[in-house]
């Protein structure tokens, strides 16, 4: 990571367009998203003073109950994108693709409010987006039914103690932090490089009884620490907000797992390919990390429907590769014993 210079997000976007003029529309769209993010940040920052942001309403496209802040964020980002060179939007909060400007060159996939379960309790929430070129034709879904490698940019926003805007336009991943006084995002982490290996993993361990064998074995061996085949101790982290875990991995490494499991409807996990896993994968790869569905590269997956789900494993390259070894039978085997099963956590 090179030393940040405090330059603004606008400065960075200008430099990217100077480097590649074809990114002008993408840069304009990112500016619109950043402006909306500042507004959403102000609402989140007011907490209960802004009303009951956790109030439940209707169900969204995936069957989740929408909360008030979900709706607020969706409306604000849609308003922003109406002013951008965007033809179509696929949002978690809309069942179908929303058409905006006919003939515009870009399509945006967005999760307006990631981490909805954290609303109302003072924990981190965020926004995730991916930008793609429009696919010409009459099918408004076609622009999104392409591999993640077609993305021209991706990013996420973390609304926490600080508001950060994490973005890539295919030339490295950077973090900009909101200067609340000036309402400007300023560069604080330049040209991020994820360390190849680290001693942290993130997974929702409450689902252990539903995991398949490879995931159970990987986590078991992490938990055994220096007494197991990984030969070192690990810490577990889980924030219930993908953006927060992703930002932590970008800064200090580790591995994040949201696997598929044997619950009904969870064979492909819970995260959505277009507006969660593909954008995160782009950002992680641009920072020197890896992102897979456990075995195959996320960026090469092609959605067959707008709200398609995908398992997700991302982070330090050696850790992601290690997970893949468990799936294909190459995992470490030294010292595996029934002791851990007797403790109960990983018993099938």
Swiss-Prot record:
Transmembrane helix as UniProt keyword: no
Location in the cell: Cytoplasm
Binding-site list for Mg(2+) 2: 111, 114, 276
GO molecular function: fructose 1,6-bisphosphate 1-phosphatase activity; magnesium ion binding
UniProt record, GO biological process: fructose 1,6-bisphosphate metabolic process; fructose 6-phosphate metabolic process; fructose metabolic process; gluconeogenesis; sucrose biosynthetic process
Residues the record lists as binding Mg(2+) 1: 92, 111, 113
One Pfam family cited in the UniProt record for this chain: FBPase_C
Superkingdom: Bacteria
Catalytic activity, EC: 3.1.3.11
UniProt-listed InterPro entries: FBPase_C_dom (IPR044015), FBPase_class-1 (IPR000146), FBPase_N (IPR033391), FBPtase (IPR028343), Fructose_bisphosphatase_AS (IPR020548)
Catalytic reaction equation(s): beta-D-fructose 1,6-bisphosphate + H2O = beta-D-fructose 6-phosphate + phosphate
GO CC term (a single one): cytosol
Cofactor: how bound: Binds 2 magnesium ions per subunit.
SUPFAM superfamilies linked to this entry: Carbohydrate phosphatase
Chain residues that bind substrate: 114-117, 204
Keywords: Carbohydrate metabolism, Cytoplasm, Hydrolase, Magnesium, Metal-binding
Presence of the UniProt keyword Magnesium in the record: yes
Cofactor(s) named in the record: Mg(2+)
Pathway given in the UniProt record: Carbohydrate biosynthesis; gluconeogenesis
Broad enzyme group: hydrolase
Record-stated family: Belongs to the FBPase class 1 family.
The protein's assembly and partners: Homotetramer.
Protein name: Fructose-1,6-bisphosphatase class 1
């Amino acid at each position: 990571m090179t030393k940040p210079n405090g330059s603004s997000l606008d400065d960075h976007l200008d430099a990217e367009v100077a480097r590649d003029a074809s990114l002008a529309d993408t840069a304009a769209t990112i500016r619109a998203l950043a402006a909306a993010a500042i507004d959403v940040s102000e609402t989140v920052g007011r907490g209960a003073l802004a009303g009951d942001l956790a109030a439940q309403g209707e169900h969204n496209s995936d069957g989740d109950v929408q909360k008030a802040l979900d709706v607020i964020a969706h409306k604000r980002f849609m308003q922003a994108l109406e002013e951008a060179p965007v033809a179509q939007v696929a949002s978690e909060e809309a069942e179908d693709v929303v058409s905006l400007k006919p003939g515009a060159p870009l399509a945006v996939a967005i999760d307006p409010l990631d981490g909805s379960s954290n609303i109302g309790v003072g924990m981190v929430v965020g926004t995730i987006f991916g930008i793609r070129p429009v696919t010409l034709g009459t099918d408004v879904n076609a622009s999104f039914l392409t591999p993640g490698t077609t993305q021209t940019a991706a990013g996420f926003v973390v609304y926490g103690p600080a508001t950060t805007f994490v973005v890539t336009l295919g030339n490295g991943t950077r973090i900009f932090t909101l200067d609340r006084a000036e309402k400007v995002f300023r560069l604080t982490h330049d040209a991020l490089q994820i360390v190849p290996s680290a001693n942290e993993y993130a997974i929702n361990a409450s689902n252990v009884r539903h995991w398949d064998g490879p995931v159970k074995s990987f986590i078991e061996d992490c938990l055994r620490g220096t007494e197991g085949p990984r030969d070192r101790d690990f810490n577990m982290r889980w924030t219930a907000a993908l953006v927060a875990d992703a930002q932590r991995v970008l800064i200090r490494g580790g591995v994040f797992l949201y696997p598929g499991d044997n619950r009904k409807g969870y064979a492909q996990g819970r995260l959505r390919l277009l507006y969660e896993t593909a954008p995160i994968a782009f950002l992680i790869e641009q920072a020197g990390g890896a992102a897979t569905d456990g075995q195959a590269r996320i960026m090469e997956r092609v959605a067959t429907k707008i709200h398609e789900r995908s398992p997700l494993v991302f982070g330090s390259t050696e850790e992601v590769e290690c997970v893949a070894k468990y799936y294909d039978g190459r995992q470490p085997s030294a010292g595996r014993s029934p002791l851990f099963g007797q403790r109960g956590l990983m018993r099938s």
